[in-house]
Amino acid sequence: MTQDQLLAGLKKDVRSLLVSSKHGLTPEHLRRDYQSMLGFPMPLRLLGFRNVLDMVKEMPEVVRLEYQLDGNIILKAIGDDTTKGIEELVSKQRDHKPKPNNRKGKPGYFNISYPRLQPVILPRRGQAKPALPAHLRSQLKQLLSHGPVRLSELESRYVAQFGKPLNVTQYGFFSISEMLSAAMDFIIMQQSRTGSQLLLRSAVTPQNQPENLMRRFSMQSTSPKQRLAGFSPKASSLPERRPEVSLDPSSVSKPEPVKEEQSFEETVFKLEEELRQQILEKGTAGTVSQELKEKLRKVVAENGNGISIHNLPTEYQRMHGEELPVSQCGFLSVTEMVGALSDTLAIQRGTDESESHWMVVEFKPIDTQPCEPELSPGDGTTSSPTGELQNPSSRAFYFSCPESAWEHEETEPLTDSQESDAELRVANKTIHQMVNLFPELMVSRVSAVPLDAVRCQKLKPPVHRKERELLPVLVEQTESPSYFYIRFSQNKEARALENMMIEMRSCYSYPDVAERYRLPDAYVRPGQVCCVAPRDMWFYRVVIHEVFSETEVKVYYVDYGDITKVERHSLRFLKACYADLPAQAVPAMLAGVRPITNIWPASAVSCFQRLCCERTLVAGVHSYQEDFLLLFLCDTNTEEDVYVHLALIQEGHAQPCSAAYGLVSEKFNPVTSYFGYDQLEDVKESLSPFSCSPDAEIDSQGNDSPSSCRTASNSESGETNLASIDVDPNLDLPPLEVINVPDVNTAAKSENVNPFEALVRKDPLFNSEWDQGWTAEDKTDETKFELDVSTEQSKPETVYTPSPVQAAVGKQQLCASPVEPKVNATTCVNPHNPVPIQINCSYPVLPGVPVYPVKPPISQFMMQLLGNPVYQGPGPNTAFQHLTSPLALRPAARMSAGGQILHWS
């Protein structure tokens, strides 16, 4: 019987039981009636339900829930067309009434009967009424301090104030009226035209007192200017009195600004004290009156070394002739009461060795310490302000706090940048204009990989289980009964996986975080740990299985066992905190069976998937064979347990064999390939772009080095060098690519020459050569230029000195006939053994490591286009002076040519 058939039969039986009950059944009664009528318990576990209420949630068309006055749940049936007649008969049934107890008494005995109501069952307690807890007293005081509250609005106002319902039963009260009767010492009830109102018995400090304190504090903080200007009316009306005031010795000995500065710190200290008192009054300490606090302080003060907490009630009764009102104030013990009075009393450990001996002492703030003698106020005018300023500062928390790191301002970098700006203004015109021309196209020496990213580490392998252990598992990916992946469920690791996926989704969903953790091309390699979101929703931990193409890679899902293709740009670095959890997908084999032939047929695989997938199974661990888990699978969701290996044998898809049968060596094993505690090979980190500051150029001038930014990577020393480039500031150049051209030296430049004059010509001579020059093979042959920059007084012109390129373009490549483009001579090597590729014969770069260009370098060809060419090669070089059509240009060149390209014919 399938689960759907079992659930349909259960719905029919439950409806029949509930329809026959006129007033419904409780969940427990329904369970007992089901077992007594059918003879077996309800199949809750077989259908995946934990209790009857979980089953009811899945049957909204059969059962409805009702709540009684005492909070019990009653289940009633929802009838259909087949149960209308039975419902009418059940509704006409008479309710069962208990027989009255008719006692025959003596003559004159009258039996008086009263209507009996069903009592509400509530938790019972002793005879004494409970005391109001201290925190509830404090909350009620805060609620009523805003003003009177109507009795009908007490619960709603309490929820709005504190964010939780007023549940008086958890404090031992039967009703709100009983709770209010216990709070009659500070709450009174008055009748008004709108109904009963609750208000405080005694006056309470208004809630806007802190605002008054802040207003008074602001007035006092601004008072020095007003007091200093107090003499201004007299001074304005009587200007001749100014010398008298300045010559008066009494006014000179007591300057007003120092006095007002002292009052500022005193005001801060008083403000903190008043705020602290307000906080204490809002807490549990506010439930104790000041009179009781003073009495307790006197009892403790009589004993210089403190009094034992066990003797405090006795001493209090001996001194004041009354018992200590602990329960009346809402406290359960003397220790709780003394702990709440932190502004008056303190608890310390006793001097003896007993740990349970506590002493109650009078509270003395630690901060109020006497000042040092040299800082104490004296008779002179110099020492008096210092001593008066130190004492409030030592007591006030505002002045004792250390300076925060966020408030610390570093002035040295600002000074350096200001000096650099000053030096830049004195520098020559070329450097100043280069900074403005390329403001954000330089390279930083800071790593582009986040510090908490998993770079070369491997994930932890799945946890090994003990033999003969029974575990709940989920079959995730199936290839055959001899090769599939399982994942353990209903354990701590499964819950950790769910929480981790939720955290990963919330983390990587931010665009800035996703862009920062984007996986560079250098790290796209087999075995690299990363994460990916296939449908842009949930992120999964993956390991790169194979680099399929330039845009796609195959990844292995370490927690689910799938291998799929994903886009290369969707890969992200995995944060280190998400690598602590071991891989959850375990490669497994079904023990005890083998295929009838050498391979498993498609019918056997589909049967195995039907028996295992989309349900929780019980796995019996047999053993491990080369990190493959050999196990038995059992389906306990049906009435009878179904063993998967026996079901395959019965249906004729397999034959029995020894439990250890399997060809593990021929299968892909991710545990040995991708997991472990070793690491992959280190990758030369690429550099992230940043704005080249003028400081770097000024420093390079001071060191007699070219003012340039270096972008070629050195694999041996790890340093970074960039080719120096100088650009005419009057040109707005588009980003152009690099091609191989012969050595050309530019001797002079003319500002009046159109830089794209050669591009707009229509002479059809250089069609194939143009296409060959812009191919992707020539992108690595970049030209290195060095720029000697000096002041305008020493060198009025800037001269390019290009270094020789790696390979010059021959005449055969420049012919007009369509020939095969010449590919750079490279040797095919094993990708696992990287060989340095020479770029410009001086910068070896490993294959696969990207070199990020700073800005488009200017090739010899572009230098010839941008200036007056002086060709030094053997013979005329006419190939670079003609172009077949403007449509052969790249989009950037066509945009730079502007409107002149429209006049070509």
Curated annotation (Swiss-Prot):
HTH OST-type domain: residues covered: 6-79, 128-204, 288-364
Name of the protein in question: Tudor domain-containing protein 5
Bias (Polar residues) ranges: 379-393, 700-723
Region (Disordered): 219-264, 368-393, 694-728
Sequence similarity: Belongs to the TDRD5 family.
Record's subcellular location: Cytoplasm
GO biological process, one term: spermatid development
Main function: Required during spermiogenesis to participate in the repression transposable elements and prevent their mobilization, which is essential for the germline integrity. Probably acts via the piRNA metabolic process, which mediates the repression of transposable elements during meiosis by forming complexes composed of piRNAs and Piwi proteins and govern the methylation and subsequent repression of transposons.
Provenance organism: Danio rerio
Gene3D superfamilies found in the cross-reference section: 2.30.30.140, 2.40.50.90, LOTUS domain-like
Example of a GO cellular component annotation carried by this entry: chromatoid body
PROSITE patterns: HTH_OST, TUDOR
PANTHER family: TUDOR DOMAIN CONTAINING PROTEIN (PTHR22948), TUDOR DOMAIN-CONTAINING PROTEIN 5 (PTHR22948:SF19)
InterPro entries on file: LOTUS-like, OST-HTH/LOTUS_dom, SNase_OB-fold_sf, TDRD5_LOTUS_2, Tudor, Tudor_domain_containing
Span of domain Tudor: 523-581
UniProtKB keywords: Cytoplasm, Developmental protein, Differentiation, Repeat, Spermatogenesis
